[in-house]
């Protein structure tokens, strides 16, 4: 995991109030690019400053608006990110599932803040269908089991602090995708359902007889393309 840490919270006395942390991810499902886990920390007394930004789930915002909010959130909050590249995802998927990969990154970020603060509440977008099970698994990985945890589906829509984390994660991943395009050309959004992404991968695999390093080899889309290549080789040999 690569970490990108940005600490530019205004230096308010955090001992004077509860610390609020929001956690969310971007890039869970794509076949191309990293999964980004983001955390946003703020003193509870400063929450009105987030409310004033008019935050929503990142998926409901335009690219331009997300980028504007990314800057404003970074000025108000302490932001921390974990970027898990495709190679690392593939490596971990051999022994654990995607939920556990995500849980590991969530707990890594949460523990960073828990070390510094005892009076803390953590809001997190539950990546499991069972909210309570997810909350229990998350808590088991924390260095302080007494912190307050609010783990819910659609937390990015219901809590501004999680919306902020969602925006940080989404913009970070989008920036990585833009960097990829400088090398590989048009690759689309990276999602398997995106026609541009499917076209890019298919052309790349057929031209290079393998997947690009930016693709997740453990995804069904990737496996199917590689299978096509193998079947094509067999057909040519038989022919």
Swiss-Prot record:
UniProt keywords, alphabetically: Cytoplasm, Endonuclease, Hydrolase, Manganese, Metal-binding, Nuclease
InterPro entries in the cross-refs: RNase_H2_suA, RNase_HII/HIII, RNase_HII/HIII_dom, RNase_HII_arc, RNase_HII_hlx-loop-hlx_cap_dom, RNaseH-like_sf, RNaseH_sf
Role this protein plays: Endonuclease that specifically degrades the RNA of RNA-DNA hybrids.
Cofactor binding, note field: Manganese or magnesium. Binds 1 divalent metal ion per monomer in the absence of substrate. May bind a second metal ion after substrate binding.
Cofactor or coenzyme needed: Mn(2+); Mg(2+)
E.C. numbers: 3.1.26.4
Example of a GO cellular component annotation carried by this entry: cytoplasm
CDD domains registered for this protein in UniProt: RNase_HII_archaea_like
Keyword set includes rRNA processing: no
Binding-site residues, a divalent metal cation: 24-25, 125
Catalytic activity: Endonucleolytic cleavage to 5'-phosphomonoester
The keyword Manganese is annotated on this UniProt entry: yes
Name of the protein this chain belongs to: Ribonuclease HII
Family: Belongs to the RNase HII family.
GO biological process: DNA replication, removal of RNA primer; mismatch repair
Gene Ontology MF terms in the entry: manganese ion binding; RNA binding; RNA-DNA hybrid ribonuclease activity
SUPFAM superfamilies per the UniProt record, alphabetical: Ribonuclease H-like
Compartments reported by the entry: Cytoplasm
PROSITE patterns, sorted: RNASE_H_2 (PS51975)
RNase H type-2 domain boundaries: 18-231
Family annotation (HAMAP family): RNase_HII_A
Organism: Methanococcus maripaludis (strain C5 / ATCC BAA-1333)
Family annotation (PANTHER family): RIBONUCLEASE, RIBONUCLEASE H2 SUBUNIT A
């Amino acid at each position: 995991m690569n970490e990108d840490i940005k600490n530019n919270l205004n230096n308010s006395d955090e001992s004077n109030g509860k610390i609020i942390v929001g956690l969310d991810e971007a890039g869970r499902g794509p076949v191309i690019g990293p999964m980004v886990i983001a955390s946003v920390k703020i003193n509870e007394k400063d929450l009105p400053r987030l409310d004033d930004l008019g935050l929503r789930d990142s998926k409901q915002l335009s690219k331009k608006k997300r980028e504007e909010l990314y800057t404003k959130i970074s000025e108000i909050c302490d932001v921390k990110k974990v970027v898990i590249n495709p190679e690392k995802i593939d490596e971990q998927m051999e022994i654990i599932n995607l939920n556990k990969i995500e849980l590991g990154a969530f707990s890594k970020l949460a523990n960073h803040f828990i070390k510094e603060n005892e009076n803390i509440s953590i809001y997190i977008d539950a990546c499991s269908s069972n909210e309570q099970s997810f909350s229990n698994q998350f808590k088991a990985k924390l260095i302080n089991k007494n912190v307050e945890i609010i783990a819910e589906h659609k937390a990015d829509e219901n809590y501004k602090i999680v919306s902020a984390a969602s925006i940080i994660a989404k913009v970070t991943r989008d920036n990585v995708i833009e960097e990829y395009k400088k090398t590989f050309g048009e690759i689309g959004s990276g999602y398997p359902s995106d026609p541009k992404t499917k076209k890019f991968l298919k052309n790349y695999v057929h031209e290079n007889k393998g997947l690009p390093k930016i693709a997740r080899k453990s995804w069904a889309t990737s496996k199917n393309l590689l299978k096509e290549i193998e079947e094509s080789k067999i057909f040519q040999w038989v022919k």
